[in-house]
């Protein structure tokens, strides 16, 4: 059984990685 904290932890982790990749792609396009 997955706890709520674990669920939000994984969700926050995926969201953070997505944001980092999005920012990285934007920086590459700006150059």
From Swiss-Prot:
Pfam families: PetL
InterPro entries per record: Cyt_b6/f_cplx_su6
UniProt keyword list: Chloroplast, Electron transport, Membrane, Photosynthesis, Plastid, Thylakoid, Transmembrane, Transmembrane helix, Transport
CC terms in the record's Gene Ontology section: chloroplast thylakoid membrane; cytochrome b6f complex
Topological type in the membrane: Single-pass membrane protein
Transmembrane segments: 4-24
Gene Ontology terms for molecular function: electron transporter, transferring electrons within cytochrome b6/f complex of photosystem II activity
Location of the protein in the cell: Plastid, Chloroplast thylakoid membrane
Disulfide bonds: none
A biological process from GO: photosynthesis
Keyword Transmembrane helix in annotation: yes
Summary of subunit composition and partner proteins: The 4 large subunits of the cytochrome b6-f complex are cytochrome b6, subunit IV (17 kDa polypeptide, PetD), cytochrome f and the Rieske protein, while the 4 small subunits are PetG, PetL, PetM and PetN. The complex functions as a dimer.
Family according to the record: Belongs to the PetL family.
Function of the protein: Component of the cytochrome b6-f complex, which mediates electron transfer between photosystem II (PSII) and photosystem I (PSI), cyclic electron flow around PSI, and state transitions. PetL is important for photoautotrophic growth as well as for electron transfer efficiency and stability of the cytochrome b6-f complex.
Protein name per Swiss-Prot or TrEMBL: Cytochrome b6-f complex subunit 6
Species per Swiss-Prot/TrEMBL record: Chaetosphaeridium globosum (Charophycean green alga)
Gene: petL
């Amino acid at each position: 059984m997955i706890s709520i904290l674990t669920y939000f932890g994984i969700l926050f982790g995926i969201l953070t990685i997505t944001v980092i990749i999005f920012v990285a792609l934007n920086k590459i396009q700006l150059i």
